């Protein structure tokens, strides 16, 4: 049984991580919960029989009995400092995205992890969902030939419009977050996970709606000043005549477009926008050599948990206890971080930006439901 600690007991903890731990409760449990707001930490601790709530980080890190894994679920600008402090205390960390704010910060974290011999596990977990495990394996087997391009779109209006959002929506519209770091990151991990490291990017975009009004009942009517770009259109060159395009936005009231489409020289794969968050969900496949010449829905063997966030918890368990190769690596997360930061620079300068980091592409992990 993995003994987990949770730092940050806000919306993402309550909405996904805690239900995910409960769903996998025969293999993992929460023993310690930290938040600067005592009520939040206590609410999480009360969900587990032997958990303790903390508002002191020192006390949390000194939790009696220790912890096998600590989830860093704090706001994005805090990730680097929290992860470093937890690792320096000797613990293994699973951090929400992004790994840090800069590539240099991410490299510093990887150095600490290497000294501890405990690699950082980095969200998002898109590539370890059943769908994308299957897709990676399908492409590696030549199922539709050589991948040529990916077109991805992800967005909405951001958390200010989520009536049931539990946290503070303002941070998502400020420097250090925005749509690319909040949700575009999911598709960037898919694009690089399937096509490999990017070599160059060019982006256009900006602040299209400079003031937001919240729809969250407890904050209804409050105004948010947007200080970071809320729309990105990014072209990505992966080399070897392979390309990608990502549209990432907090200025998209709705859309009927697919969330993700991959084109290869003998076929295509499409994922509906209403399907993408279900990691066990179907993908539509088109093959040029299919006599019917039509789309076919393919559903992979399901994993015990299907959510994109929750799938990462399962992968962490299987990595720590079963020796499953780590797919959610710090190298891959750092590469995606550089792409996101390069997109911001490209908006400012109008230039194409060379990407300097890389990562070793991980082989597909077989889909297994046990």
Regions found by a protein language model. Give the residues of each.
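Active-site loop of classical SDR/Rossmann-like NAD(P)-dependent oxidoreductases
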Residues: 12, 36-39, 302-314
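C-terminal helix-rich "cap/oligomerization" subdomain common to oxidoreductases
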Residues: 69-71, 118, 316-370
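Contiguous beta-strand/loop segments that form the cofactor/metal-binding neighborhood of enzyme cores
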Residues: 189-280, 312-322, 360-370
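Beta-loop-alpha module in the N-terminal Rossmann-like domain of NAD(P)-dependent dehydrogenases
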Residues: 48-112
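Rossmann-fold dehydrogenase core element
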Residues: 108-126, 145-150
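Hydrophobic residues in well-ordered beta-strands that form the structural core
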Residues: 55, 95, 120-122, 246, ...
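N-terminal Rossmann-like dinucleotide-binding module
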Residues: 1-48
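Predominantly a Rossmann-like dinucleotide-binding segment in NAD(P)-dependent oxidoreductases
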Residues: 126-225, 350
């Amino acid at each position: 049984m993995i003994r987990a600690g949770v730092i940050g007991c806000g919306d993402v903890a309550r909405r996904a991580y805690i239900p995910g731990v409960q769903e996998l409760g025969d293999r993992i449990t929460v023993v310690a919960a930290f938040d600067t707001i005592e009520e939040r930490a206590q609410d999480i601790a009360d969900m587990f029989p032997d958990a303790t709530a903390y508002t002191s980080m020192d006390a949390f890190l000194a939790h009696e009995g220790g912890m096998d894994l600590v989830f860093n679920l704090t706001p994005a600008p805090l990730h680097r400092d929290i992860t470093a402090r937890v690792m320096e205390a000797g613990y293994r960390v699973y951090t929400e995205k992004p790994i840090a704010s800069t590539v240099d910060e991410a490299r510093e974290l990887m150095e600490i992890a290497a000294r501890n011999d405990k690699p950082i596990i980095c969200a998002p977990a898109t590539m370890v969902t059943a769908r994308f495990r299957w897709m990676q394996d399908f492409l590696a087997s030549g199922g539709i030939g050589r991948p040529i391009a990916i077109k991805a779109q992800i967005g909405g209006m951001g958390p200010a419009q989520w009536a049931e959002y539990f946290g503070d929506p303002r941070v998502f519209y400020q420097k250090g977050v925005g749509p690319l770091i909040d949700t575009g990151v999911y598709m960037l991990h898919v694009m690089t996970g399937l096509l490999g490291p990017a070599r160059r990017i060019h982006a256009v975009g900006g602040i299209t709606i400079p003031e937001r009004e919240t729809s969250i009942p407890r904050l209804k009517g409050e105004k948010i000043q947007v200080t970071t770009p809320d729309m990105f259109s990014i072209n990505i060159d992966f080399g070897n005549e392979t390309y990608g395009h990502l549209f990432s936005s907090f200025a998209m009231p709705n859309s009927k477009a697919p969330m993700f489409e991959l084109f290869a020289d003998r076929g295509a794969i499409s994922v509906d926008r209403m399907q993408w968050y279900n990691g066990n969900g179907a993908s539509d496949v088109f093959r040029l050599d299919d006599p019917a010449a039509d789309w076919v829905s393919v559903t992979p063997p399901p994993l015990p948990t299907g959510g994109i966030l929750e799938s990462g918890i399962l992968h962490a368990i299987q990595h720590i206890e079963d020796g499953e190769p780590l797919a959610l690596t710090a190298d891959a997360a750092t590469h995606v971080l550089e792409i996101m930061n390069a997109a911001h620079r490209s908006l400012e300068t109008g230039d194409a930006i060379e990407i300097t980091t890389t990562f070793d592409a991980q082989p597909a992990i077989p889909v297994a439901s046990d």
